[in-house]
Structures are given as structure tokens and as C-alpha cells.
């Protein structure tokens, strides 16, 4: 059984990332302002997700998933719906693999375009949702 808890500094480094996300960890996860959560299964961190405030009214949604996490994606998506539902303004996210795009679309994000050679030389799709 998995459990949801508030994100703590360092949690992002405990996720054994899916192969598609290898190299995606960035230090900003621990210093970002905004709501974030961690998912554990049997005491092992399997996913982290949250919003990072860029400036007033603009946020960056982020998520890190382990190879075990797809079974938990529905639960992560439900938790992110609650976080996003309380946030007004523009929320952006990027996706570098199809499962991430499906995850964002399930959250109501719309694809705005493709950013070529965006991170680690890979193309990323830019997604956003805007709420007032």
C-alpha cells in the first residue's frame, strides 16, 4: 500500500527514476516555493510531484516517477488535481516521453508546442493550463 505525505528536502534524490527521466533531477526541487508531495510504498519513495512558484501567477509543475510508480499514477494525478485546483494563474510543465504527456493531459494541461533540445539535448513538449 502506498502513502502520500508532504515533500521533504532530499526526497527527489530518493526516487529510482524511470529510464525516460534519467538525468532529470535538478537541485531546484529542494528549494522551490510551492506545494509538493511524496509517495511512498513500503517506506520506499516511488514518486515526488509538486508546483514550483516562478513568480506571482506563474508556476512550474514537476513530477519524478520510479519504474514502480505507474501503478500509482492515478493516485498521484488525483493529488495533483487537488494542488492545481487551488492554484490560480499559469501552470507550465514539460514532458519528454509519452507517459508524461498522457499524465499531463489527464490533469487538464494543453500542449502548446515542442521545445527542441530543451534539457539534456532532448526535445520536450510544453504543456500549460491557465486559470483565473
Each language-model region and where it sits:
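Conserved beta-strand-loop-alpha-helix junction that forms the acyl-donor binding cleft
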Residues: 87, 91-105, 110, 118-119
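Acidic/histidine-enriched, beta-strand-rich ligand/metal-binding domains
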Residues: 26-29, 62-63, 75-82
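Conserved acetyl-CoA binding element of GNAT-fold acetyltransferases
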Residues: 55-68, 125
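Short amphipathic alpha-helix that is part of the acyltransferase structural core
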Residues: 1-27
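C-terminal "cap" of GNAT-fold acetyltransferases
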Residues: 61, 118-132
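A conserved beta-strand-loop-helix scaffold within acyl/acetyltransferase catalytic domains
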Residues: 32-33, 49-57, 112-116
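Conserved acetyl-CoA-binding loop-helix of GNAT-fold acetyltransferases
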Residues: 70-86, 102, 106
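Conserved beta-strand in the GNAT
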Residues: 38, 43-53, 59-60
Amino acid at each position: 500500500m502506498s502513502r502520500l505525505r508532504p515533500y521533504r528536502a532530499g526526497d527527489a534524490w530518493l526516487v529510482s527514476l524511470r529510464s525516460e527521466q534519467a538525468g532529470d533531477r535538478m537541485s531546484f526541487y529542494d528549494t522551490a516555493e510551492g506545494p509538493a508531495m511524496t509517495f511512498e510504498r513500503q517506506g520506499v519513495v516511488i514518486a515526488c510531484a509538486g508546483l514550483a512558484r516562478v513568480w506571482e501567477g506563474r508556476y512550474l509543475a514537476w513530477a519524478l516517477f520510479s519504474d514502480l510508480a505507474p501503478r500509482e499514477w492515478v493516485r498521484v494525478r488525483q493529488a495533483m488535481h487537488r494542488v492545481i485546483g487551488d492554484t490560480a494563474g499559469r501552470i507550465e510543465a514539460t514532458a519528454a516521453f509519452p507517459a508524461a504527456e498522457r499524465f499531463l493531459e489527464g490533469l487538464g494541461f494543453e500542449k502548446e508546442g515542442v521545445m527542441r533540445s530543451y534539457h539534456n539535448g532532448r526535445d520536450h513538449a510544453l504543456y500549460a493550463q491557465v486559470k483565473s
